[in-house]
Amino acid sequence: MRPERVSDEATGSPAPDDTDPVNPFDPLDPFAPVTLPWTTPSPPAVPTAPTAPTAPAASDDGRGRIEGFASASAVAPGDSIDFHVTVDPPRPFRVTVHRIGHYDGRGAAEIVTSPRLDGTAQLPPLTAGRTVSCHHWWLSWRLPVPSYWSAGAYVAVLATEDGRHQAHVPFTVRDDRASDLLLVLPDLTWQAYNPYPAADGRAGASLAPADDEHEAADPVTTVTFDRPYAGDGLPPQAGHAYDVIRWAERYGYDLGYATAGDLHAGRVAPARHRGLVFPGRDEYWTDEMRTAVEDARERGTSLVFLAARTLYRRIEPAPAPSGSDRLLTCGRRRGRPGPALWRENDRAEQQLLGIQYAGPVPRPRPLIVRNAGHWLWEATGAHEGDALDGLVAGGADRYYPRTPLPAHDERILLAHSPYGDRQGARRHQETSLYRAPSGAWVFASGTLAWSPALDRPGHADPRIQRATANLFDRICKRD
């Protein structure tokens, strides 16, 4: 069946409704908030009067309580990472560091706890235009990362000694060894979407164009890593990456870890890995990131993009008083509000991914299987035309016939899923796989629901788990 035409077909430019598909702080988002072991309240050990268990209250950007940020998004074993924390009113606190992983279904493991620390109320954030920075906050605790620590995604939990309030600071421990798969955590996109100091996700210092009442008059063009993440300190989009990590570690894949910032700065060598995995929403890319990934593909490294809206916006890091690449600047679109797009600079994302962003999906819709005889769908139980409920959600990609494709020896679309946009127009999602002349596989899921289908309670789908295993096994050359 011929895909329906849309008004932007000729240029491959964004869908007319180009606002953010999900408000990161919207409780209706089916993939938020991130749930981790220490955020789930436990019932009392000794029976008492029937009262509801309570977890520590999260930080509130309007009143402070406790919140903080780290001096780096990623560190190598043997380096150290600094935490800058404010506690208002001042009280003692501790920092407990957890590593994300399967850990027999627990989802994380406690690694180390700081000594008792004296909390202080730091000075208010500084502002320059609408850029908000806390780079002037005093050092609260320095963590030397031992050389024996495993690479991975870590979360530092800041908790007041009285147990009433807590917040989070995510960071990554990378290593230099070659691995089958290198997971690239999207720290640039997390920070671009960070609306701190807004507590409700609206009108904050974020590069995201949606839900910003000041957008037209005074757009944000620069944000900084020198500030906490809004709300409880954990980027809502981080859950997508954590889903992939828990699932992949459970099944024993040989994983390395890095961040988008590492990729930008050249701190990792992509071609040393069989595949690069981009596990979650990874919208904001630098020129250096794209060049590194394209070069890796040309050298035979496979690419796995597990979320829609990848490589959509173009961003440029810059130095700050606190260090290199601590600022993120995004130019504005030509003649329209919002950050600059790759496809408006003659480098549409489809030229790397094989598909590109089509628009938001207002309500979850089924993913419709196509080419079910392909090896990706082998042993999944999926048949031609099967509907995988809820697997097209948040946002969707598709193939644009008039936008150039990357060079390929093989190419196939593995899903074609209709949905309606916010105006009621018919749209469709597609899942893409192609093989580059170098032999590298390039997979793009085309949906924001793929990663949660791997390990998220209430969203896990064994067919997607098996399909992803087929892909990873092919890349890792497992029999």
Could you describe each region identified by the protein language model?
Residues E4, G12, N23-P44, P56-R65:
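Proline/serine/threonine-rich low-complexity linkers at boundaries of modular beta-sandwich domains
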Residues E67-P92, T96-Y103, A108-F171:
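Ligand-binding face of N-terminal immunoglobulin V-set domains in extracellular IgSF glycoproteins
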Residues P90-H102, A108-P115, G163-A269:
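Aromatic-Pro/Gly-enriched surface loop or interdomain linker
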Residues T120-H135, S140-P144, Y148-S150, G233-P319, ...:
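Helical hinge/lid and interdomain linker segments adjacent to catalytic or ligand-binding clefts
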Residues V155, L182, R274-P279, V304, ...:
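Structural motif
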Residues D232-P235, P337-W342, A348, S451-D461:
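Active-site rim elements
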Residues R250, P406-D479:
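Extracellular low-complexity, Gly/Ser/Thr-rich intrinsically disordered linkers
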Residues L311-G424:
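An acidic, glycine-rich "communication" segment
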